[in-house]
């Protein structure tokens, strides 16, 4: 839900088949890390399952369809990441942006890899998350950032 299908270019892709996606989705990225940490901890303790869903039609205005249920046996886990956007003005008098992603331990992640593993191409990934990051205030380094949760569906980790 909310992703752009790389083949048909529809933002609301609930009608798209899985082969339309730009890649295999092995995780999802969500805001509110503390909430997701609590939920994923319950899954890891065997007290809950992770229900992976998508909208059947228009997001937030249609029923959700459950795709699968995941447990600790599937490798469900969480990692905190920070998406940064650096802004500057060049000689052309236009604002330019550079994006980077780091884990909470400051290990950098290739933005192409994280986008692909989230089922998106890099441009769609940046466009999707830029809507939230642009609402943040500039820090002293001229960057804006947003803390996010990567919810892993498999044993893969960055």
Identify the residue ranges that each predicted region occupies:
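Catalytic phosphate/metal-binding cores of nucleic-acid and nucleotide-processing enzymes, i.e., regions
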Residues: 1-158
């Amino acid at each position: 839900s909310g992703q752009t299908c790389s083949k048909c270019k529809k933002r609301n892709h609930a009608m798209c088949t899985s082969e339309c996606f730009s890649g295999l989705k092995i995780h999802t990225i969500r805001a509110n890390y503390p909430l997701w940490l609590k939920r994923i901890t319950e899954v890891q303790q065997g007290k809950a399952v992770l229900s992976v869903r998508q909208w059947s039609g228009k997001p937030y205005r249609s029923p959700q369809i459950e795709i699968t249920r995941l447990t600790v046996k599937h490798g469900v886990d969480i990692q905190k990441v920070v998406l940064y956007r650096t802004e500057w003005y060049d000689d052309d008098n236009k604002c330019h942006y550079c994006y980077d992603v780091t884990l909470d331990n400051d290990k950098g992640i290739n933005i192409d890899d994280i986008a692909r593993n989230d089922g998106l191409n890099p441009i769609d990934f940046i466009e999707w998350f830029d809507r939230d990051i642009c609402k943040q205030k500039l820090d002293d380094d001229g960057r804006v950032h947003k803390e996010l949760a990567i919810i892993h569906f498999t044993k893969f980790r960055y």
